[in-house]
Curated annotation (Swiss-Prot):
Name the UniProt record assigns to this protein: Putative protein TIC 214 C-terminal part
Key word Cell inner membrane present: no
Gene Ontology CC: chloroplast
Upper taxonomic lineage: Eukaryota, Viridiplantae, Streptophyta, Embryophyta, Marchantiophyta
Gene behind the chain: TIC214
Domain of life according to the entry: Eukaryota
Subcellular location as annotated: Plastid, Chloroplast
Record flagged with keyword Transport: yes
Self-association and partners: Part of the Tic complex.
Role played: Involved in protein precursor import into chloroplasts. May be part of an intermediate translocation complex acting as a protein-conducting channel at the inner envelope.
GO biological process, one term: protein transport
Family named by the database record: Belongs to the TIC214 family.
Swiss-Prot/TrEMBL keywords: Chloroplast, Plastid, Protein transport, Transport
């Protein structure tokens, strides 16, 4: 199909002549005289899209070339452009094919880039998680060096063939349960178990790890004194209470479904009660005539098909169980006694005084004394326990019995030797860099936003 521009069409029309006059010339001569031709021609040209913004008053024989400039120019074919400007034609053709090749190649490049980005991100995540896991193992082994068996058992599990057929969606931290007494364990199901938990000092180290979904079947180990069993006990108790409630006596009551029904039945009941007390026949006849008007009610409400449930609602309720006065008094007094006993138990510090006095001052063994004075226990404890420890320590210092300390004994036992200084400086809780690393791995923070959560001392105070 050959494309022809509007200018080309008008030029051809202009060249057509009949009696040495073109159609357009004849039309333009009679343009002003015949207005109806002007309007029809203008509407036709506007519908065809030939005339838009141009005014037809300027459409004359003299300036027809200027009028033709307002139309779209003729688009030559590629062969004609090759004859006119061969170099420009070649450049445009090469640009056209280059753009098409780039469009085809770009999606593949983007896909490959995205795949590479995904793979690199997963590898980085795995490296980070492994690094975090190693750091946690090291820190836990420092604090709980006596229970190395749990860590060894966990490390040896990878040698088994259980993990070959398991697919896990995400990289997850596994838990390990270590308990020497197998009596206290109950197997919830007979499927394979991949649920581990560290049995570490939770009083010293908080647990921030959450459980995540896994695709494989699990065997859950439940202790006898666990929360799950307590919940089961509560359910059984609730079932027993529900059975006791069902045994209590109940009062049955029927309630009308609507107030209009209730009013109509009251009318009928009142009329029937009056009929029993009346003796005169005239009054009975007058009442019966009134009741005939309401006989439709009897037909509606007392049919064979109608039942009581269609007209009324059962609103029965059980009687409450009577409580003795002694039970109420016991419950009221027991709460008060429990609160009083709890306050007394918290305020009683005799046991703590004895324990701290023995460990800090009265015990003259070298190892125990060195353990409590060479390391700062506040750095290991949690914030809540740290406050308690400080309060108890301040209370014990007021005791005269425990403050009697022989300074000469301390000077003899603890001299400023190089070995002790090196040991205390190398210990992780006193090094600024190690604490920063522990903060990053435990609280998952790269910057120092939560660095205040860990209290540290750059250099510990040495005994003089």
């Amino acid at each position: 199909m050959i494309l022809i521009s509007q200018a080309y069409v008008f030029n051809k029309i202009w060249e057509i002549k009949t009696k040495n006059k073109s159609y357009l010339k004849c039309l333009l001569k009679y343009w002003t005289s015949h207005l109806w031709i002007k309007k029809n021609f203008q509407s036709f040209l506007s519908n065809q899209g030939i005339v838009g913004s141009l005014e037809l008053q300027n459409f004359k024989e003299e300036n027809w070339k200027e009028w033709l400039k307002g139309f779209n120019r003729y688009n030559f074919s590629s062969k004609e452009w090759y004859k006119i400007t061969p170099q420009q034609w070649r450049n445009k053709v090469s640009e056209h094919w280059k753009n098409q090749e780039n469009k085809k190649l770009n999606p593949n490049q983007q896909i490959s880039k995205n795949n590479f980005f995904i793979n690199t991100s997963i590898l980085e995540q795995t490296k980070k998680r492994n690094k975090i896991f190693k750091q946690n193992l090291l820190t836990y082994s420092c604090f709980d060096f006596t229970k190395n068996l749990a860590i060894r058992n966990f490390l040896n599990l990878n040698r088994k063939k259980i993990y070959n057929n398991i697919i896990i969606n995400k990289i997850q931290k596994s838990y390990f349960i270590y308990n020497k007494k197998a009596k206290y364990l109950d197997f919830f199901s007979q499927k394979q178990n991949i649920f581990f938990e560290y049995n570490l000092l939770l009083w010293l180290i908080p647990e921030f790890i959450e459980e995540k979904n896994q695709y494989q079947n699990k065997r859950i180990l439940i202790l006898k004194n666990s929360i799950i069993k307590e919940n089961n006990k509560k359910i059984i108790q609730n079932q027993k209470l529900f059975r006791k409630r069902e045994l209590n006596q109940s009062i049955r009551q029927w309630r009308w479904k609507s107030k209009s029904l209730e009013k109509k039945f009251k009318k009928l009941g009142n009329m029937a009660s009056l009929m029993t007390f009346m003796q005169n026949q005239e009054n009975i006849i007058s009442l019966s005539s009134k009741m005939r008007e309401d006989l439709k009610l009897f037909h509606l409400f007392f049919r064979r098909n109608t039942t009581i449930n269609q007209l009324t609602i059962n609103s029965e309720h059980r009687l409450a169980r009577l409580l003795d006065d002694q039970i109420l008094m016991y419950k009221m007094v027991s709460t008060f006694l429990n609160i009083k006993y709890r306050f007394k138990r918290l305020s009683n510090l005799d046991n703590f005084d004895d324990f701290l006095g023995i460990q800090f001052f009265e015990n003259k063994e070298k190892n125990n004394f060195f353990f409590f004075n060479s390391f700062n226990l506040e750095d290991i404890l949690l914030p809540k326990r740290r406050r308690k420890f400080r309060i108890l320590n301040s209370l014990t210092s007021k005791n005269k019995k425990n403050t009697q300390l022989n300074q000469k004994f301390v000077q003899k036992k603890f001299s400023k030797t190089k070995i002790k200084k090196i040991k205390r400086f190398i210990w992780a809780s006193y090094r600024f860099e190690d604490l920063a690393c522990m903060n990053r791995f435990w609280f998952n923070t790269i910057n120092g936003s939560r660095f205040s959560m860990l209290r540290f001392r750059m250099y510990p105070s040495l005994l003089t």
